[in-house]
Amino acid sequence: MSALKSLVPARFLTLTAHLVIIITIFWSRDNNIQSCLPLEFTEDQYRTEDTRLTVALSVTLALFVLELAGFLSGVSMFNSNQALLSLITHSSACVCLSFFVFHQWPCWTYWIIFSICSVFPAVVELFLLLSQRVL
């Protein structure tokens, strides 16, 4: 199997793993929200952090739709540069988000992980889609 053809399943698996972790965080975000707050917090503070994390996770899911659309439509499936970028960023996201969940990192760290590991590959995917005149 050539190196390019082995990137396709690896990219799909890392995209899927990242998606599963995001959905898991979405369903069980209570512990992560509490780690963002001081020991004594009000209901208002909790709702604010819950809204922030919900928005961040929702935008991440929207970017996944964009990236999966480009991948599954075949526009970027065999583009080796996008495959490597996606493989590296989504693998890094899986590791970082695992630490985010298990070590209960503060919520602001999610935005750093989001900007590097979700926005960057989605923007490149958008450029690829636009260059093929798919969108």
From Swiss-Prot:
Entry keyword set: Cilium biogenesis/degradation, Developmental protein, Membrane, Transmembrane, Transmembrane helix
Lineage: Eukaryota, Metazoa, Chordata, Craniata, Vertebrata
Function: May play a role in cilia formation and embryonic patterning.
Name used for this protein in its record: Transmembrane protein 107
Subcellular location: Membrane
Pfam family, one: TMEM107
Bilayer-spanning residue ranges: 7-27, 55-75, 83-103, 110-130
Domain of life: Eukaryota
Kinase recorded as keyword: no
